[in-house]
């Protein structure tokens, strides 16, 4: 049984999903019925409930095309807001992850090499139907595939570009086990923004992320992407509220800058279920603004920080000020 600061985070619930046995919500339920204490959320973390015509339209398009969204799979607090505005972040390579990170609620298991050959086409058609000029793709980790799913990921980007030539694409990728050729496959697919998350500060990475992930490996992936395609914007994200210090956040900023990352997002870690890691503290909006200003002072081209900010939250609005080298674009994607 794994522990985080003495709190067990494993044991129980296996379900069948798409013909694959998975651990629901990414971590097993505790046998003793106990879990980490869930802190009461402050008022500034209250999110909009799903509903409205825009929400129903997006839900219909996503489900009709058998697509997964990180909005649903990760229990994103912004789902109601983003879907009501007609946007979503597509999760490719299926909905079952081969890794078990202790902050994440995506189901885990072994997909045994399964891929949906129609997924690139369905992504492209959904982007067209939603009228998006900026779209974010993300994915689960696929350690069961030799290339980590890089070629399928690139096919999705190319299909979107073929049907929607004026649409900018951001790819929020896994680490592909640090494989440079896999990174090259995705970064050469025609995207505008390559994103990969370090997730947490260096000290917490071994306790929070799957053992196959790593802080240094994530930095290397970002650095390789920039080296291979200097004109592509690179982006990463940090969660806060897991016990990190301000000095450790500053260190992470410096590490990301050395990896030539252009854009950083920072958001509050929220515990998906009682079986996931506990929240150590809630960071106030004023503290997030101070972190944003510190990141800008250190040299990032843009920093997006706030309690409900997630990697892909209103991603295109980062570009609206034209300070990152791309023109302003239209409807945003969750």
Swiss-Prot record:
Q: Name one GO molecular function term.
A: lipoate synthase activity
Q: Which PROSITE patterns match?
A: RADICAL_SAM
Where it mainly occurs, coarsely classed, is cytoplasm
Which Gene Ontology cellular component terms are annotated? Answer: cytoplasm
Q: What Pfam families does the record point to?
A: LIAS_N (PF16881), Radical_SAM (PF04055)
Subcellular location field: Cytoplasm
Q: What class of enzyme is it?
A: transferase
For binding [4Fe-4S] cluster 2, which residues are annotated in this chain's numbering?
A: 97, 101, 104
Q: Which reaction does it catalyse?
A: [[Fe-S] cluster scaffold protein carrying a second [4Fe-4S](2+) cluster] + N(6)-octanoyl-L-lysyl-[protein] + 2 oxidized [2Fe-2S]-[ferredoxin] + 2 S-adenosyl-L-methionine + 4 H(+) = [[Fe-S] cluster scaffold protein] + N(6)-[(R)-dihydrolipoyl]-L-lysyl-[protein] + 4 Fe(3+) + 2 hydrogen sulfide + 2 5'-deoxyadenosine + 2 L-methionine + 2 reduced [2Fe-2S]-[ferredoxin]
Does Lipid biosynthesis count among this protein's keywords?
A: no
PANTHER family in UniProt: LIPOYL SYNTHASE, LIPOYL SYNTHASE, MITOCHONDRIAL
Protein name, UniProt field = Lipoyl synthase
The record lists the organism as Halorhodospira halophila (strain DSM 244 / SL1)
In the UniProt record, what gene is named as encoding this protein? lipA
């Amino acid at each position: 049984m794994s522990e985080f600061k003495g709190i067990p985070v494993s044991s129980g619930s296996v379900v069948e999903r798409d013909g694959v046995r998975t651990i629901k919500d990414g971590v097993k339920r505790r046998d003793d019925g106990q879990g980490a204490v869930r802190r009461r959320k402050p008022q500034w973390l209250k999110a909009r409930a799903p509903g409205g015509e825009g929400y129903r339209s997006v839900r219909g398009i996503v489900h009709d095309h058998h697509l997964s969204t990180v909005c649903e799979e990760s229990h994103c607090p912004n789902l109601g807001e983003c879907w009501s505005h007609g946007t979503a972040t597509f999760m490719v390579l299926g909905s079952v992850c081969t890794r078990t990170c202790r902050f994440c609620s995506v189901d885990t298991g072994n997909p045994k090499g399964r891929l949906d050959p129609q997924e690139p086409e369905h992504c492209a058609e959904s982007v067209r139907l939603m009228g998006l000029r900026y779209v974010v793709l993300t994915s689960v980790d696929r350690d069961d595939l030799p290339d980590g799913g890089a070629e399928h990921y690139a096919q999705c980007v190319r299909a979107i570009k073929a049907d929607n030539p004026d649409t900018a694409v951001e790819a929020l990728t896994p680490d592909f086990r640090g494989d440079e050729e896999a990174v090259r496959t995705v970064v050469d697919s025609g995207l505008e923004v390559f994103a990969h998350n370090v997730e947490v500060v260096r000290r917490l990475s071994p306790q929070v992320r799957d053992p196959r992930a790593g802080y240094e490996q994530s930095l290397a992936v970002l650095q390789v992407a920039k080296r291979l395609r200097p004109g592509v914007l690179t982006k990463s994200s940090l969660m806060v509220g897991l016990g990190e210090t301000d000095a450790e956040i500053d260190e992470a900023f410096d590490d990301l800058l050395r990896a030539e990352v252009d854009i950083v997002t920072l958001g509050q870690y929220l515990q998906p279920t009682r079986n996931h890691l506990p929240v150590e503290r809630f960071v106030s909006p004023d503290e997030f603004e101070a972190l944003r200003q510190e990141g800008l002072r250190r040299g990032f081209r843009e920093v997006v920080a706030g309690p409900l900010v997630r990697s892909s939250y209103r991603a295109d609005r980062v570009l609206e000020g034209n300070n990152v080298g791309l023109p302003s674009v239209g409807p945003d994607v969750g």
